[in-house]
Regions:
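Positively charged, low-complexity intrinsically disordered leader regions
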Residues: 1-60, 64
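Phosphate/diphosphate ligand-binding glycine-rich loop within oxidoreductases
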Residues: 36, 40-146
């Protein structure tokens, strides 16, 4: 995994230029996948997915992306992980960080994701909190860019 990886908690954490580069990468990966040539950029990497509430689309999206890019996703079900109850968020972040390359968290409270960030030694991705859902925002903006009229800019949408 690259040392350039960082937490993805809010789209505001990235500059406009960085977000546009992310959109371009998504476009290139989508094109490669259409012809069966998806690069194995995450070969051997593991994603720990912490879910405090069930989700179909978020879970499937992350699992499929990891698989197509050569990695593996580990789904920690709501009944299996009790953040801040059976063990502290700090302990959870520290232990899971030793076993995976990235943590994705879908939590009931935004503070939980921030606590994971404060204690994890690997990048943390916000998969939904009561504050925002940045991975969905990126997907929605990409879809708008992909389907916009040729004479319109993204700000016109």
């Amino acid at each position: 995994m690259s040392a350039a990886l960082r937490h993805f908690i809010d789209t505001q954490d990235f500059s406009r230029e960085e977000l546009l580069r992310i959109m371009e990468l998504i476009r290139l990966l989508k094109e490669a996948d259409k012809v069966g040539a998806c690069p194995r950029l995450l070969q051997g990497a593991s994603l720990g997915m912490i879910f405090e509430e069930p989700s179909t689309r978020t879970r499937v999206s992350f699992e499929v992306a990891m698989t197509k890019l050569g990695g593996h996703a580990l789904y920690l079900r709501p009944g299996e992980i009790h953040l801040g109850k059976r063990e502290s968020i700090r302990d959870t972040a520290e232990v899971i960080s030793r076993m995976v390359d990235v943590i994705e968290a879908r939590t009931l409270k935004h503070k939980t994701v921030l606590d994971l960030v404060a204690n994890a030694t690997v990048p943390v991705m916000n998969g939904l909190t009561d504050y925002n859902h940045p991975t969905q925002v990126v997907c929605d903006v990409f879809t708008m860019m992909e389907h916009k009229l040729p004479d319109k800019s993204l700000t016109d949408l």
